[in-house]
Amino acid sequence: RHAGSAHTF
């Protein structure tokens, strides 16, 4: 889960 990702894992 990264705040810059388009798809959060």
From Swiss-Prot:
Its main location: cytoplasm. One of its GO terms (molecular function) is metal ion binding. The lineage of its organism: Bacteria, Bacillati, Actinomycetota, Actinomycetes, Kitasatosporales. GO terms for biological process: D-xylose metabolic process. The keyword Metal-binding applies. This is Xylose isomerase. It comes from Streptomyces sp. (strain NCL 82-5-1). Involved in D-xylose catabolism. Belongs to the xylose isomerase family. It is found in: Cytoplasm. Its EC number is 5.3.1.5. Keywords: Carbohydrate metabolism, Cytoplasm, Isomerase, Magnesium, Metal-binding, Xylose metabolism. Its cofactor is Mg(2+). It catalyses: alpha-D-xylose = alpha-D-xylulofuranose. Homotetramer. Binds 2 magnesium ions per subunit. One of its GO terms (cellular component) is cytoplasm.
